[in-house]
Amino acid sequence: MTKVNMKVNIAGVELKNPVMTASGTFGSGREYGEYVDLNQLGAVVVKGVANEPWKGNPSPRIAETYGGMLNSVGLQNPGVDEFIEKDIPFLRQYNTKIIVNIAGRTIEDYCEVVKKLGDADVDLLELNISCPNVKAGGVCFGTDPFMVEEVTKAVKKVAKQPLIVKLTPNVTDIVPIAKAAVAGGADGISLINTLLGMAIDIHKRKPILANVMGGFSGPAIKPVALRMVYQVANAVDVPIIGMGGIMTGEDAVEFILAGASGVAVGTANFINPRATIDVIEGIQGYMEQYSIKDLKEIRGSL
């Protein structure tokens, strides 16, 4: 049997394997402790944290759809101070890397969170630029290349950990957005966030979600995610974390072939709490089947 090396390097941080959780689908790991040995994961990407506690959106926030789900949780979180006090000590019990997803309503919001995390024992930061920019009339940060470069540059200036920028797919062309993030100093790119979607209750003749629209995720979005990862991998020279509809090891291998260094498992966690472990084992099985000793051999090899 081929001895396989699943280690990957994301912006100078070595992970034991490429598999991590997608932000917002795994909390800070406590909820899954009964099912998943966190020591086996390459990294835990925690639910987005903001400078102050966010209440999130009104219910209903979740709607099942064909091939996936819609969510409109609204980044409910207790704030970065509570995260530092309670969640980091919990996660540091495990031999896994910690990636903190950061939310904000203004550039200043993002920077304040990053400053507070400066001396915290975390490994990487993930900047969620799918948030609306309150100072720009609610326009999503991640849909405008100028804003993407501006917010990335500001956050990078105060960040002490490597900075990953998470891209929204709700754009005409993902490549200028990725290039803007790199121009702003991003050490890596993660994509995709959720697609904007909607579901309607035909009996009540009302939207199912209280917020009307929400983020669409699950296996149905994988072809879109793969296409965007492939495009970005061919356009920028920084590590990429690919996500969007990953349910199995085979799905993850597709993302690696498209150019991703890491892969994040999201919606699958709700269906199968052990999804991350299954994906790790699936990648390992694929490598053994094809006598692949190191993931570098196949990354971006299309």
Swiss-Prot record:
| Localization per record | Cytoplasm
Q: Which Gene3D superfamilies match?
A: Aldolase class I
Query: Short name of one Pfam family for this protein?
Result: DHO_dh
Requisite cofactors: FMN
Q: What is its main location?
A: cytoplasm
Cofactor binding notes? Binds 1 FMN per subunit.
A GO cellular-component term linked to this record: cytoplasm
What are the record keywords, sorted?
Cytoplasm, Flavoprotein, FMN, NAD, Oxidoreductase, Pyrimidine biosynthesis
- GO MF entry, a single one: dihydroorotate dehydrogenase (NAD+) activity
Please state what class of enzyme this protein is.
oxidoreductase
Q: Which InterPro entries match?
A: Aldolase_TIM (IPR013785), DHO_dehydrogenase (IPR050074), DHOD_1B (IPR033888), Dihydroorotate_DH_1 (IPR024920), Dihydroorotate_DH_1_2 (IPR012135), Dihydroorotate_DH_cat (IPR005720), Dihydroorotate_DH_CS (IPR001295), Dihydroorotate_DH_I (IPR049622)
Q: What is its EC number?
A: 1.3.1.14
Tell me a GO biological process for this protein: 'de novo' pyrimidine nucleobase biosynthetic process
Residues that bind substrate? 47, 71-75, 128, 193-194
Pathway membership = Pyrimidine metabolism; UMP biosynthesis via de novo pathway; orotate from (S)-dihydroorotate (NAD(+) route): step 1/1
Q: Which domain of life is it from?
A: Bacteria
Q: Which residues bind FMN?
A: 23, 47-48, 101, 128, 166, 192, 218, 244-245, 266-267
* Catalytic site positions: 131
Its family remark reads: Belongs to the dihydroorotate dehydrogenase family. Type 1 subfamily.
PANTHER family per UniProt? DIHYDROOROTATE DEHYDROGENASE (FUMARATE), DIHYDROOROTATE DEHYDROGENASE (QUINONE), MITOCHONDRIAL-RELATED
Q: Briefly state the protein's biological role.
A: Catalyzes the conversion of dihydroorotate to orotate with NAD(+) as electron acceptor.
Describe its partners and assembly state: Heterotetramer of 2 PyrK and 2 PyrD type B subunits.
Q: What is the official name of this protein in its record?
A: Dihydroorotate dehydrogenase B (NAD(+)), catalytic subunit
- Which organism encodes this protein? Alkaliphilus metalliredigens (strain QYMF)
